[in-house]
Amino acid sequence: MSNVTVSVFTLDKSISEEPVLPSSFIPSSGNVFPKFTSAIPKTAWELWYFDGISKDDRSSIVIGVTRNAEGLKHGGFKVQVFVIWADERTWHRDLFFPESVVSIDESGATEGIWKHATSSSSISFSCAGDLSKASLVFDVPGIVQGDMHLEALPGDTGLDTDATLGPSVYYVRPLGRASVKAQLSLYSSDATAAEQFILGTSANGGMDRVWSPLSWPQVMTESYYLRAQVGPYAMQIMRIFPPKGSENSENQPSTMARLYREGQLICAPQHVVTRDDALITHDSLILSKQNTSDSGDAVTGEYRDKNTGYTVEFVGKGNEEQRWEFQVRHERIIWNTPTSRPGPDATGNTGFVERLYGGTIGESYEGVGTGGQCELS
């Protein structure tokens, strides 16, 4: 067997009361192996995120695999599973496993398993060392069983660009653009037989790796996430607003956004600007909320932010002619999760199936994606 490095987390031994420094970011790498290898402080977190959506029937799947101190409340490290069928039915479970083991061999191939030995249940993932593919296996009898497969699409990866999201978060996309297949058997609490979920044809998605030594409330007050395919364009966006008094002294929003055309990276914003900014010296993102509906049947989140979508603009550095604009409209709700107490000013986290159209001047491509918006305060 080749040399293997292993990170083993157990709930009773791996949450630290003391500060723990993460291992270093590795440039031009997927950084799939954990950054907190033996213990994680109570504020820190690590996320392995996978998603896929069918452009044909809008079925979608979203998986979040985490290590953080939240497990102390629930008896395990969390894996979230969300699906939405073509007929808009949804299924969601937060599953908790007391043991998490991730290994990497000398080729860079990484395997992770979140498991419960007593119940013989687990959810696992693997990622090839060359980042050509990734897979997940779900084996939680009576709840979810099946698999999900991602295969990297040809072209640029974007891994040689800046991976910071503000001063405190690393945001890496090991498979930022991938074809996706999934087939799951899903059980509801009132059902004796499983429902089958098969991700529709022509599905695209990807895998993200995100970590920070600071908790989400220390990092942001609001966020928007998007991964979409629109004609020849693929886009990936994460944008956050920092809390007042954070390390972001100017209290400016941060982004880690990428735009590809036919597999070629054409714009890589790390800066959020407005249309009023006179001189744009870096690749930049303009992200504006929309609150209009042409048909009167607008889809919004359940909480106080009632926007119906966004206008997304990618602007090339120093060149106003390098501008790509896309309209994003919320089409379906995948999840609504509160982040505050109920009430008229309640905040929350909403996942969407997004419908998009746009391009550069003279273009009008259409496409779909998965989006998520969150308010914490």
Swiss-Prot record:
Its EC number(s): 5.5.1.-
Pathway: Mycotoxin biosynthesis
Source organism superkingdom: Eukaryota
Assigned keywords, A-Z: Isomerase
Keyword Transferase in record: no
UniProt enzyme class: isomerase
Reaction catalysed by this enzyme: (5S)-3-[(2E,6R,8E,10E,12E)-2,6-dimethyltetradeca-2,8,10,12-tetraenoyl]-5-(hydroxymethyl)pyrrolidine-2,4-dione = trichosetin
UniProt GO molecular function: isomerase activity
Pfam families for the chain: DA_C (PF22903), DA_N (PF24137)
InterPro entries attached to this UniProt entry: DA_C (IPR054499)
Family label: Belongs to the Diels-Alderase family.
Role, per record: Diels-Alderase; part of the gene cluster that mediates the biosynthesis of equisetin, a trans-fused decalin-containing tetramic acid with antimicrobial activity. The PKS module of eqxS together with the enoylreductase eqxC catalyze the formation of the polyketide unit which is then conjugated to L-serine by the condensation domain of the eqxS NRPS module. Activity of the Dieckmann cyclase domain (RED) results in release of the Dieckmann product intermediate.
Protein name per Swiss-Prot or TrEMBL: Diels-Alderase fsa2
Organism: Fusarium heterosporum
